[in-house]
Amino acid sequence: MSSPFQQILTTTSATNAIAASSAVPVECLHARGANSLASNAHTVLPGLDSQASPQSGQKEEMRRKNAEAQMQNDSNHSETTLFQSDLDTALQSLGYGSQTNQAYQNHPSRSREDITNSRAERHSQTSTQPKNVHAVSEPMATTSLDCGVLPLPSSALDEEFLNLDFPNQERIYIDLEPQHSNSTSSSSDEKCHCLSHIIQSLNRNRQGNHIRRDSMNKIHLLNEAAEQFLMCDSNHSKLWYIILLALYQDADDSLSSAEEPQERMGAHSGAKGFCGNIKSNLDTMVCHASLAWILNG
């Protein structure tokens, strides 16, 4: 039977043997684990790199595209600014605005600050221009008569103004004859009576029947007054020739339009011949009055 000391030695040696036998697998395990981890790391890292490289490439591509778009926007903005500057310069040299420029000013692509600044600049340029400046192509035609540019009437018209509603014939004669006429004198015996004869003839014809006046009698009176008037040596006013022509024209119109009764005209054939003679005398006296007016003018 072995002693206790021998049993202890046997147990110790057995333990050492077990430990020695178990140390080799542990070391081998550690070596194999380290090698496998390294190999696995080398295997995994390329896979991660291959997975990360497309994502980084996409990000880089997006970053590059964004930079190009920003550069393009900057270039477009600079070109727009240059175009607007050239357009404003051209419009200022021409001196007028255009609808194209107005549409461009209000385009939504332009910023609100640029639109406000351009409007303020146009307002200042418009306010500095004078009010009375007109375009060269503006028509100057007018459709109404401007009375401000008409000359003033002559004072001779006021002196020769006619007013037949006077109480007596002498006042009519004095006021109808112009003051600068040579026919007016201090002595009433030396005054010309041809004008008063015309007034008397007209007054006698006016005192007749106002409803139906005798046109032929009026023409006879005008013939007598005109003959005396044309033979007068006084320097009468030109207005009297106009009065005579107007009186003859009025008598001619009355003679042409009036229908006289047959008993007042006499026989029908005789009336036609008599009216023809009156019209002939009328035309002759009108010619004489016109000629005298021209010669004395």
From Swiss-Prot:
Which Gene Ontology cellular-component terms appear in the entry? nucleus
Polar residues: bias regions: 69-80
Signal sequence, renumbered to the chain: none
Q: List where in the cell it is found.
A: Nucleus
Sorted alphabetically, which keywords does the UniProt record give? Nucleus, Transcription, Transcription regulation, Virulence
Basic and acidic residues biased stretches:
58-67, 110-124
The primary location reported for this protein is nucleus
Q: Region Disordered: list its residue ranges.
A: 45-80, 100-134
Q: What function does the entry list? A: Probable transcription factor; part of the gene cluster that mediates the biosynthesis of the secondary metabolite victorin, the molecular basis for Victoria blight of oats. May play a role in the regulation of the production of victorin.
Protein name, UniProt field: Probable transcription factor vicR
Q: Which organism is it from?
A: Bipolaris victoriae (strain FI3)
